[in-house]
Amino acid sequence: MSRAGSGSSPGARGAALALWALWALWALPAAVSGCSCAPAHPQQLLCDAALVIRAKISSEKVVPASDDPLDSHKMIRYEIKQIKMFKGFEKLKDVQYVYTPFDSSLCGVKLEANNKKQYLLTGQILSDGKVLIHLCNYIEPWDDLSLSQKKSLNQRYQMGCGCKITTCYSVPCSITAPNECLWTDWLLERRLQGHQARHYACIRRSDGTCSWYRGGPPPEKEFMDISEP
């Protein structure tokens, strides 16, 4: 945890506290087993993020985590070229840098800084305006996204932010509320980036219920009925 020196400004102390309050949450499991993230559907990760952009990484630099001279923690500062912003307009117009913990045990993200590869980046906006990204955010090479995922970034995912996506690990698995969608990729395919993650969004209907909407090519197999064992 960083310490604010007697010569630090209130702004620097506030920025450091905001940053390390987030880091403290990651450091608890990291101290034992490294970075650990709960499984989440891409839609849920985008709904939880304050910022969603498409960007290239121009360069990277290791920088101090705060202006506090007593703080020895480091961050990686990625200089980016923003291509498109999908979420976060009301807080930032253009993003020049994103920051991530230097240590992978604190969920730091390693990106290719060659100004060629494009990424979908999601993250948080700190009180000092810095954009923070980590492994528990949804960060993917743009070319790895399905056509349905790319189209869903504009509006479809955000239309379902009032829905709840529940991960199914075993049967029986059933909804407990009308605004719930069951995510079965892990149960059926033993992977998180399965058909539902790549081709489906959980959308709220006019009657308040939520259901899966297929925005891309149909999957190779239909989902099985897992409401009963």
Predicted regions and their residues:
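Transition segments tied to proteolytic processing and entry into folded domains
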Residues: 2-229
